[in-house]
Amino acid sequence: MTTLAPPAADSRAKPKQRPGDRWFSGTALFAGSMILVTLAAVAIFLIVQSIPGITATSENASVLTSTFWNYVWPLAFGTLWASLLALLMAVPLSVSVALFISHYAPRRLAQTLGYIVDLLAAVPSVVFGLWGILVLAPAVQPVYSWLVDNAGWFPLFAGPVSGTGRTIFTAAMVLAVMVTPIITAICREIFLQTPVLHEEAALALGATRWEMVRMAVFPFGRSGIVSASMLGLGRALGETMAVALVLSATGVITFELFTSVNPSTIPANIALTFPEAYGVNVNVLIATGLILFIVTFAVNALARWIVSRRKEFSGAN
């Protein structure tokens, strides 16, 4: 005769929640929801306040010469152009510095450089702006003159050259200096997370230090480099004071880097124009802020898409 044993308790039963667990879960849910609520509130405010500005003309808005789109297009171009130039300068430098700190520098030197990078990331933007207008612009102006005289046939180096050095390229260099610490700090942490077994396996197979970095470190950190670059691009897109101090803007569309006729950026234009704006002019400036909001949101969304596409090939899994 056999007896049936009572069924064992379901091992997948949920553990009993304590009051503290429920309180913490509710607090975390509330905090996460507030992020979405804040983002939605900002978007709604920008959309509602932008409608009068988008539909405005030169008849009821003194900042416009024709339509809103003719007004905002040079600003959007200047914002993207300056940020792209800054990113082209900052990313190679940041990756190189991060790689040196994480895999080449002695321990003490790496710690010192890491502290310096972290301190540079905390410097206020107005300090970078003052450095750009008082130190960098006068220093690079002779270089601009030489490039225009000897390589003026190249469209980007066409003249006439600016006599003050306050050009779109100078503003881009200041932006590059500002975003370099951010990109460097993130890339450094990504490189340090490379599995040691991957590095040791590459070296055991006879790879040199550079080959190990190229075959193990870079594939692992590729998505992190993209994320860091997009984060730096977001900082460059929204920078205000440094660009407003350095750039001598005239609100045109031009790819020339060294002339005194430079496109402005949306944040700098808002900062310089808003104190004297009134009526529909305020709505026009808010509408330009909406354009910047959309561009920044699109950049972040693109970064997340790129990271998700490359994640399975990064070696992180």
Describe each region flagged by the PLM:
Residues 119, 123, 127, 183-190, ...:
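Transmembrane alpha-helices
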Residues 56-73, 128-177, 248, 257-258:
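Membrane-interfacial helix termini and adjacent extracytoplasmic/periplasmic loops
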Residues 73, 77, 81-89, 93, ...:
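Hydrophobic alpha-helical transmembrane segments of multipass integral membrane proteins
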Residues 235-279:
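Glycine-rich helix-loop "coupling/hinge" segments at transmembrane-helix boundaries
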Residues 9-27, 46-88, 106, 161, ...:
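Periplasmic/extracellular loop-to-transmembrane helix junction in inner-membrane transport proteins
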Residues 188-192, 196, 203, 271-317:
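C-terminal transmembrane helix and the adjacent membrane-cytosol boundary/short C-terminal tail
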Residues 1-31, 303-317:
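Transmembrane alpha-helical segments of polytopic membrane transport and secretion proteins
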Residues 86-117, 303-312:
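Transmembrane-helix boundary motif in ABC transporter permease subunits
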